[in-house]
Amino acid sequence: MLRARIARWLLVSAVFSAGVSRADCADVQKAPECLPRFYQVAPGVYRGGQPKDGGFELLKQRGVRTIINLRDEHDERERVEALGFHYVYLPMDARDEISAGTIQTFLDTVSDPARQPVFIHCQRGADRTGFMVGLYRIAKQGWSPEKAYDEARDIGMRWWYRGLKRQIFEFAEKAHPEGRGAAGK
């Protein structure tokens, strides 16, 4: 398992160190290089890491309407708004408690058909993005916290952010106090 993760990390590093030009991102086959950890969560909901050069343009071609930035950096607003996206800035630190207000704004935005399709990202598309997608899975898709956390971990959430794991389980308790979703869905 660890060897597979290391091999995957080396492969991803090699791809990114090779460099990708904006013209390459016009080719849909180059999506993994332009949009790290790009993945469809549900119809109208996508996740990934910080788009590389040309990545936002590729998202536009795919019909994405809203960009949700979970990074502390706020440097992409002008660029994504110029491309016609709706921009939602929800900065968070994976080491801190994520506020209920931030979580609710996220869930409201992702669930609003007028804002879909949405693309959610942080720097790596793993820790903060994995956390928020896990909450979406629990709240909107009825997933168990175990399944939501396992998916986040499998996509790259790092184990040392124990507060994120704890919050996923606490959120599930509040979202489904009767135990719905805990059956492993």
Description of each model-found segment:
Residues 122:
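Short cysteine clusters
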Residues 125:
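Substrate/cofactor-recognition hotspot
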Residues 2, 15-119, 131-185:
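Cys-dependent protein tyrosine phosphatase-like superfamily
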Residues 1-10:
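Bacterial N-terminal signal peptides that target proteins for export
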Residues 128:
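Conserved lysine of the Walker
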